[in-house]
Amino acid sequence: MNKRQSDIIKVLYRNGGYMTFAELAEMMNVSVKTVRNDISAIKESLSEKSSVETKPHVGVKLTMDEAEWKNISGKGDCADKEICFFIIRQLLKNGNLTAQGLAEKYYIGRGELEKILEEVSGWFMENHILFERKRGKGISISYSEFNYRLACLSFYREYIPFFEGKVNVGDAKYAFLNRSEYSAMCAALDGFDPDRAARSIIETEQDFGLEFNYDSGVNLIFLISLCILRTRKGKSVTMPKTAKCPTDGESGRIFAEKTAEKLEKEYNISLSEEEIKFMAFAADISEIRQFESESARRKFEAMNIELCRFTVKAVNLISEVAGIDLREDRFFVKQMFMQLKATTSRLKYGIICKNRLLVQIKTKYPNMMAVAWFMENIFEKELELEINEHEVGFLALHI
């Protein structure tokens, strides 16, 4: 079966009803005779569970077994995922899209299109972006710059395989990504090269004597690259109004200022006060993997005195609930401090960092989850923050 015949199957399957040979010929940009020959070939290749029905003056209709459809399409659910990728990418790049153009590009019937648009609408809602459909105007989105940037990050992380190979790049010199991962990030940033931004971040990490974990490091490179990219486009961010949290500290701000100095020289741009605040936010929500020395750790703790006090209270509570004195376990206390730095910052801004291990943690370590949930009280009492189960799962991993 050739590609055109596969495309005809997709069109008929998604349409769900009769289509004329002329309609198919126009879509495939071939003659009606060619379509008739293709339909004959398709009939011969289908299993007994599937069939192609033709009616004079009505057209052709495909009835196909679901398993055979997935086998023939070669994609199954991935086909819908690819269409979702296209829609989200176009809307994030251009702000609008016509449903007709989408249907023509992917040969999607109305029922299939509605299903996909419902999924896309849910994705944008989850990322705090307004998704609108207006008759005669198509599909559009509206957003704050802050939510737009976080949505771009979510989109990149969720659809990395779809970005890979879309731009040709060499190996990264500073960004700790292999070629395919680096290519995906460049594509998600519309061709922007984040390697120099990665160098500035790494140099600031060295100044602080710390190292962020892998996932946080990737997110930080992406978000700070967006600062450069969006500033060049004249798209300024405004940080959301949030109540001051006792554990805020000064480390994020200092990290952002040092990084901004490097970036301004590297890219010959001027970063606004709001951009520096955004970079501080990006640093604060990042998880630290380790400090290079005790001296570096103490300096960082001095920038976050109230967080140190909150960590002590958290450790005391965990010790009491678990029936194990963990106050003298220096490794545990240090790990809890680093986790709480990112957790409190994410909760302050209402950021839900999805815990990919949550199901396994809840299944294998229910007792640790139960202990971690006891911390809900001090988050509310001391910080006026509402903790979610994803963050509880992160904390449970350290108990």
Name every feature range the model reports, one short phrase each.
Residues 1-399:
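A cross-family "folded-core" feature that marks the main globular domain of proteins
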